[in-house]
């Protein structure tokens, strides 16, 4: 438990919001699975081994529209049909599972039914400047995706796939940016896949 608490001290330094997640993550970490924390305020993804050891932290691209809840009516829609208001990265606790996208690329499903995943940076229209946004120090510049958590390809291959993208998956906590942190962190986990 001490290793978990020590590792979570690193999460707490990411933003003030991350401090409130320490107890739920420490409790869940006892189940032997790796876990990740998406800090939307800081636009980062932190990945931990099952024992609480920090495996890595990286900047992340997030949903274009700020918000903590999935937009009603957006579940099950084709990603390209989502409106600007539906392009959120919802807060919560999720049971993540390794999987493939429609192009056969390895991803980590956060919520399969909502087409929400962690994946590597892929080619996109030049006007979106995704690679530039990913390196920006301003977290607001990181708002561009349909809702997925997008990270540098090297980090995805080196940290995400070996931990969350193999075996039984893990837990992903997406911290709220507007709601109190414990309201979104607790409760029943949401399944990544049907």
What are these regions (language model features)?
Residues 20-129:
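Gly/Pro-biased beta-strand-loop elements
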């Amino acid at each position: 438990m001490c290793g978990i608490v020590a590792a979570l001290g690193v999460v707490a330094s990411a933003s003030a919001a991350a401090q409130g997640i320490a107890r739920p993550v420490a409790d869940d970490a006892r189940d032997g699975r790796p876990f990740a924390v998406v800090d939307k305020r800081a636009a980062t993804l932190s990945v931990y081994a099952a024992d609480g050891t920090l495996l890595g932290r990286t900047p992340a691209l997030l949903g274009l529209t700020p918000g903590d809840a999935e937009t009603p009516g957006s579940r099950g829609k084709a990603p390209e049909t989502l409106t600007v208001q539906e392009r959120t990265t919802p807060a919560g606790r999720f049971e993540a599972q390794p999987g493939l996208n429609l192009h056969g690329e390895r991803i980590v499903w956060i919520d399969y039914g909502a087409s929400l995943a962690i994946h590597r940076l892929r080619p996109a229209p030049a006007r979106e400047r995704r690679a530039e946004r990913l390196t920006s120090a301003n977290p607001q510049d990181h708002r561009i995706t349909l809702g997925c958590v997008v990270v540098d390809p090297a980090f995805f291959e080196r940290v995400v796939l070996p931990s969350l993208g193999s075996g039984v998956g893990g837990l992903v906590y997406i911290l709220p940016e507007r709601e109190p942190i414990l309201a979104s962190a607790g409760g029943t986990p949401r399944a990544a896949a049907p």
